[in-house]
Amino acid sequence: MIEVLVNDRLGKKIRVKCLEDDTVGDFKKVLSVQLGMQPSKIVLQKGGSVLKDHITLYDYEVHDNTNLELYYS
């Protein structure tokens, strides 16, 4: 189990517990419950690159305490 930090453009930080082998799509579902919005409206970036739903967090080198940027579509 890892904890990922998600930051939106307004300075809000959200901590999300997940597994490294979760897909980005799975991660968005967990995050959407905390945000109260549809997973399809969430866009996540790491280092300026948009994360694709079918790829795992591990493949994007997302580990414990990694920071992701949150945007809304």
From Swiss-Prot:
Presence of the UniProt keyword Transmembrane helix in the record: no
Residue ranges of domain Ubiquitin-like in the record: 1-73
GO cellular component: cytoplasm; nucleus
Top-rank taxon: Eukaryota
Annotated keywords: Ubl conjugation pathway
MF GO annotations: protein tag activity
InterPro entries xref list: Hub1/Ubl5, Ubiquitin-like_dom, Ubiquitin-like_domsf
Claim: Cell division is one of the keywords in the record: no
One GO term (biological process): positive regulation of RNA splicing
PANTHER family referenced in this protein's UniProt entry, alphabetically: UBIQUITIN-LIKE PROTEIN 5
Protein name listed in UniProt: Ubiquitin-like modifier HUB1
Record organism: Candida glabrata (strain ATCC 2001 / BCRC 20586 / JCM 3761 / NBRC 0622 / NRRL Y-65 / CBS 138) (Yeast)
The encoding gene: HUB1
